């Protein structure tokens, strides 16, 4: 009997680009086992944080396990042992012998045992980013070695002692925290990181091309201020002006510049401080923009001007400043330039983007502190679910406060004490919750927009401090969304609905600065029944194409996709709430399409090409093609962009709509290549197509397949409204040549250009998403298809989607597609509540009428 592939030995390693991580493999093994045994030398707090949702699942589902670990090299911290001891379903023992160094994971299910052994300890880096080699094997194929591993585990277990509170207390007395490895830089010279090197090179090239302004887009915590200092040092302007919106930021920026540039005088221009004669001046916008202050300087006083948080530059104060001064070079910096209240920031900088690094790239290049995000269910109080309309009393209910405290204690933090930020919806809530937390033994304060600069700075200093009585948490609404620097923040708590992905990233970013006192940041998001929960996966994934399937996939498999050691974990209820929000969201509407189109146009300074939408991470162009009021990119431009002046005949528009709406998904390459060959004026297309498909795609064209292609491109396949909509669209004729009508339309060069543009996009989409065909079919595993797609891709002569239900047999092609609603709605009728189920990984029972 042939061995099932899933039980064959395989290598388990980390490569997020291949969607492979050790952590994901372990999650699957944990959640599908009846019991488990681990023998792992090194277990870090970060490793438990990376798998917390998984360990909680094991506890909640009463899945028992055994863990053997040690105190070898003093790596395992007392805090980690305390966390393990909380899991009543796990029996933990300490191996007291010398040289304990295994990394073995054993999982039992019924009469099967799966094992993973290799190099991975339970640390966040070993689970996600390190170069690790682990071998997976199963008792189904490797029974002898499995028995030997179990025998060795039993020996270790007998030689180990139980983990108890008393043992932890004794261990804590003698435990010495390992010192972090530090690279000693003899010259003490600070050098640019990866992002900064690329950006500096780009800025230099812009100036060589006589550009006098540029925009830098860089995620919070990636070192924008240091980058600016490096560039100013390279340019060496006689005078420089650095503009920010808060005094504390100006002071911090000046300190940064002083570490990089030693031979220039630097001063502050804010409030009562007016250091006019310094080479480099750091100013607050509130002071420098005033006529009586800016006129203290000549218009060409500064050779180089930098504006931080430049997305604010639409305000009159910034505009007056920019219009007054005439520097040789102007640099704008922002993590979120899109938030500019309809003001075109890109135009302000002549569309010169020096460099762009978003959160996901910064994580990939290890520029930020890893985070462990936990989406957990907000509390239901007296049958009232927290939602967008919840009143104040519900938000500050004693039971909710106790629930929040219980959760933030459970999820914890990295380091010796908590340095936390808690974001809430309104000022009154911040003040009341701070008061209630203080009554329960915490040291907290609430900061609102009314707080003075001094009050804010004192609160931030206290939160950073490790002295007794320092703040544990600061409650705030939005004043900390940007422009603050508290590197020690190790816990971010979100007690508010996510209203936008930009604000979400800004608040998340408060904890992402690296600091020696933390290994990771804990992010706890209390998810209520909020309408815009769909912004959570958009923000965390960085995928702004608004494709619902991609958003759902990220919620389910985000850990596989996200770069670096960070993790994203949802409990089941919060996951369902996000799925519900995705389902309900109107992400295909014209309003969103128009908004994202003009956002991209503003960024590029021109009408975007079709390929630009994916290239620059904008909305999925399929939303344009599948929108029934558009169906083509031309139609979008014609309706909404006054700069677009192309006019097509009604027939030309119909051809464009057909190709865009019906073929651009790239689900089958044959029709696309047929059209391309037809445009090249090939006659007898059948022969050319067979050759092209064989040579380029290794696909053999059968007679039935070619018949299907002809039917589709001559509208013989179509049925219902689709047939009427495109009844005049005929790409090829019955003699395998380009149709006379299509040939004539192609004499219009602009029409031809747009058809080819759609074809190029569609062919690339096929290559990216649909070229891994299943056996000799045109279908791919794990892809989404409509009933009409199935009819076409199975080469049926007609579109029978309107009469297709549980299954249908097609005699002409001898195919029988079966459709199963595996997850059924609770309110369906008893007559259709079929017990569809998997018997084993290779056998599925489906029931139909």
Where are these predicted regions, by residue range?
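Walker A/P-loop
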Residues: 208-232
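Post-DEXD/H (motif II) to motif III coupling segment of the RecA-like Helicase ATP-binding lobe
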Residues: 311-372
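Conserved interdomain linker/interface between the two RecA-like ATPase lobes of SF2 helicase motors
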Residues: 353-421
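PLD/PLD-like phosphodiesterase catalytic module centered on the HKD motif
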Residues: 1-193, 197, 201, 849
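A short beta-strand element within the Helicase C-terminal
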Residues: 116-117, 473-476, 480-497, 503-506, ...
